[in-house]
Amino acid sequence: MSIFNKVTKTFQWGQHTVTMETGEIARQASGAVLVNIDDTVVLATVVASKQAKSGQDFFPLTVDYIEKTYAAGKIPGSFFKREAKPSELETLTSRLIDRPIRPLFPEGFYNDVHVVIHTVSLNPEVDADIAALIATSAALSVSGIPFNGPIGAARVGFINGEYVLNPGQTQRKDSQMDLVVAGTEAAVLMVESEAQQLPEDVMLGAVVFGHEQGRIAIDAIHELVREAGKPVWDWVAPAKDEELIAKVAALGDEALRTAYQIRNKQSRTQACREAYAAVKAGLTAQGVEFDGVKVEGMLFDIEARIVRSQILAGEPRIDGRDTRTVRPIEIRNSVLPRTHGSALFTRGETQALVVSTLGTERDAQRIDALAGEFEDRFLFHYNMPPFATGEVGRMGSTKRREIGHGRLAKRALAACLPSKEEFPYTIRVVSEITESNGSSSMASVCGGCLSMMDAGVPMKAHVAGIAMGLIKEDNRFAVLTDILGDEDHLGDMDFKVAGTTSGITALQMDIKIQGITKEIMQVALAQAKEARMHILGKMQEAMGEAKAEISSFAPKLYTMKINPEKIRDVIGKGGSTIRALTEETGTQIDIGEDGTITIASSDAAKADEAKRRIEEITAEVEIGKIYEGPVTKILDFGALVNLLPGKDGLLHISQIAHERVERVADYLQEGQIIKVKVMETDEKGRVKLSLKALTERPAGMERSDRPAPAEREFRQPREPRQQREFREPREPREPRDGGRPAAEGEQQQQQQQ
């Protein structure tokens, strides 16, 4: 009898077969589920502490997605030969899992929860992120931890006008959309997508389609829980101290209402801090014992109630705007003199200084991913230092939030980049957030587009982004355009849309509540389009099109095409030829497998010289053409002459002069520059030259009766000895000079010596 109480559930999901297992692996975790989707295998585990830490005022959820290189049959390439810090993909996938599950934990549940997901086997055609989402949902559901799930998830493609469920890597190459949606049976909670300028109705249809398909996974998880679920925790939310809440409200309500009439963020924040301090001082004066953390939570609830009620009542928002107005926009291009391209984009109290840098092909990022190696020629990096929000903080390694915001901006802009053939540069865009009061990632999209156009990148269209918010109470709701930071914290949805005048290029949605209907999403998309068009108009006013010339400080790229079979000639033995080319011309040369050569130089003359020398190296010798070159070697039967770099031809002794040549050295010396004519080439590429073909035969000179060795007539080979007819021995010939026979003369000469 097995020691395991293993439970397995299998279901068909579109073109894939999905298997979920629990009870065999990681049994000491609160919950553990192994999910297999066509050989992509993911293990998700969840562990929660039984008690919350004292004074804890937030939900400490940690999600770690880890890819094991053995999953793809690889050994890590690092010095220590083991997995190191998380890759960008691992960080993004961790965020992708965190976002839909976080709002499903009950309010007041502050116990530590740690979710760890390992990819232990990978089919390159099946992405592990969807399997990881389903495995996490199943592990939480069977664990008994307080969790209002499960959730389902699906990837949606758009190919030939139809939605495709969970397209593989190959299919996605033909897809106009890559969208991931996650949610419960009743509501969508998270959307992450990029698209090729698709209209709003197509994007909304993809969200609805993916949500419906995700319910298939939810049904299977319910079945797994019925058979293998652990008892649900006997957890009850801490009782609210109604008496303390009333006292806090009496002391702080009026002061906070007054604070939220202040339009300036810093002044408003300072007023709120003073209100918080006054409430605590008032409670102390009344002799009330209180927990400072709990009191601050109560004051935050009062802030949320004030802001939300004002908006739903149709009153002006925090900064005085209505629900559809975009904050004032200021744009300045070329703000940094020696960068390749730059833009300062300011929208209200959110500001991004965005800089673009152009590089060569070797500047592209080479990524050794689990599914295979690839190069990325478009890099987008987002940085937000503490001073952007007027705070004191530590500067350290890149945070998960910065990686996520950078990837969203990159997705938004990628659809409008020129092809590699049109613009062979590697592009790096860096967004430095210098002020932040909401929607800094969308400011990065706008600034990134403008800075690339300032750098001379021929963008297909202007790209703008806008962040939308939502306030919902019962059946009343208000969609907010261009949300502030406070509206993001106090609202129910963060909905970011980026695109062009033609359609959407990126969409990200995080919903904190259930009950967001298709109709609400339609309103949000329509309102976002209106705002996007307004911002695009401002951007087009500031910069109508990309600069015709790239910066004088950027490397100039010149491309040429050669026969792929000639690549080895350009590289040379051990790289000697290309190394000499780059050193002597002061250029950078990259060679593609298809024979495309890219020459990078800030000096056009140097690039032209490199191009000329490459053309010489790769040129084909033409029959009948006259070449000038040095004699590289003297042979007994002729000489070798260099025609082109790396290409010599044979000048036979019979082709040196019209008269008979006894010694080649009498006519030619090594290093001598001569002109020769190409007479023919054979199938092996050997070239035959002629020097005498360039001069006329002197008058009166007759052709030699005896042909030169290379020009003698072809003779049939002699028959084998056993096949020859018997012949009588011939009589010795008389010497031509009438002397002794040759043999006798030779013997006498040897005796004399």
From Swiss-Prot:
Q: What class of enzyme is it?
A: transferase
Highest rank taxon of the organism: Bacteria
Identify a single GO molecular function assigned to this protein: RNA binding
Keyword line? Cytoplasm, Magnesium, Metal-binding, Nucleotidyltransferase, RNA-binding, Transferase
Catalysed reaction per UniProt? RNA(n+1) + phosphate = RNA(n) + a ribonucleoside 5'-diphosphate
Query: Which PROSITE patterns is this protein grouped with?
Result: KH_TYPE_1 (PS50084), S1 (PS50126)
The record's subcellular locations are:
Cytoplasm
Residue ranges with Basic and acidic residues bias: 699-739
- EC? 2.7.7.8
A single cellular component GO annotation: cytosol
The biological process GO terms on file are: mRNA catabolic process; RNA processing
**Annotated family:** Belongs to the polyribonucleotide nucleotidyltransferase family.
- Physiological role: Involved in mRNA degradation. Catalyzes the phosphorolysis of single-stranded polyribonucleotides processively in the 3'- to 5'-direction.
> What is the recorded name of this protein?
Polyribonucleotide nucleotidyltransferase
Which gene specifies this protein's sequence?
Answer: pnp
